[in-house]
């Protein structure tokens, strides 16, 4: 479903600020894989997701989604294959528009659009049923402005919008990091439910090692732009946070310096 082949990306090449973010990265995801991604600051996690999404061109290598080489496609062109949820709940929705208008825009992604958003009765009923699955009461607030929603409600709506067309690949970029623990748990549980029910191939960056172990069928750890640990199946299920810390120290030769990841 997704192949990252020998991908490298360096920022500010040839300057004193030169930084190699991805260093010959190789990764293959099978259809339906739910991969959690961990690593310290600057490990290349978000750069990897941005490279896959086409936010910036890679220096070398190939990116293939569902058998299509998308390496030279723009971010807009890749949007037909990808759904994405960012860390900031304000990203991915239009605050001044109604909930149903946001859903209509998401439903028509990749299709011809007009300046006017006309929503049929059938579409409105479909949106109501989708929102009901969130169990947040939003199905009764279709005409509410999105800017009035809480961070958790808005992130849940963004998740719904990113997945309603069943993308080939779902990218979750620390999408619960800005939420309080109780709300984060609800959004994570909802994410896992949507991924499983729709059999979505997913990559989820998380700062929480416990969540990385709990969710998904596979876990990868990144360091200095490449993958240093890749585990799945029963071995992943039996992992402890202490195991991940030990693996990091062995593979990288250093201590894990992100207390937020260790203590979460």
Residue locations for each model-derived region?
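Helix-to-loop junction immediately C-terminal to a conserved catalytic motif
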Residues: 53
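Conserved ABC transporter NBD signature motif
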Residues: 61-68, 229-231
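Conserved beta-strand-loop-alpha-helix hinge in the C-terminal portion
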Residues: 226-252
């Amino acid at each position: 479903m997704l192949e990252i082949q020998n991908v490298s990306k360096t920022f500010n090449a040839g300057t004193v600020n030169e930084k190699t973010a991805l260093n010959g990265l190789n990764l293959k995801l099978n259809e339906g894989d739910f991969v959690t991604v961990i690593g310290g600051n600057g490990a290349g996690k978000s750069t990897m997701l941005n490279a896959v999404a086409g936010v910036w061109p890679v220096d070398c290598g190939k990116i293939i989604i569902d058998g299509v080489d998308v390496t030279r496609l723009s971010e807009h062109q890749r949007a037909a294959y990808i759904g994405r949820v960012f860390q900031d709940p304000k990203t991915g929705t239009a605050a001044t528009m109604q909930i149903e208008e946001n859903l209509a825009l998401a439903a028509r992604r990749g299709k011809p659009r007009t300046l006017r958003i006309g929503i049929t009765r059938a579409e409105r009923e479909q949106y109501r049923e989708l929102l009901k699955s969130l169990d947040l009461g939003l199905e009764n607030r279709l005409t509410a402005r999105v800017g009035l929603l809480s961070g958790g409600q808005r992130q849940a709506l963004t998740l719904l919008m990113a997945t309603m067309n069943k993308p080939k690949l779902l990218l979750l970029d620390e999408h619960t990091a800005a939420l309080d623990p109780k709300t984060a748990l609800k959004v994570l549980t909802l994410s896992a439910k949507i991924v499983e029910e729709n059999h979505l191939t997913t990559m989820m960056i998380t700062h929480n090692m416990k969540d990385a172990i709990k969710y998904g069928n596979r876990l990868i750890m990144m360091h200095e732009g490449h993958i240093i640990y890749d585990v799945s199946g029963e071995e992943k299920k039996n992992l402890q946070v202490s195991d991940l810390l030990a693996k990091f120290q062995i593979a990288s030769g250093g201590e894990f310096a992100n207390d937020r990841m260790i203590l979460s």
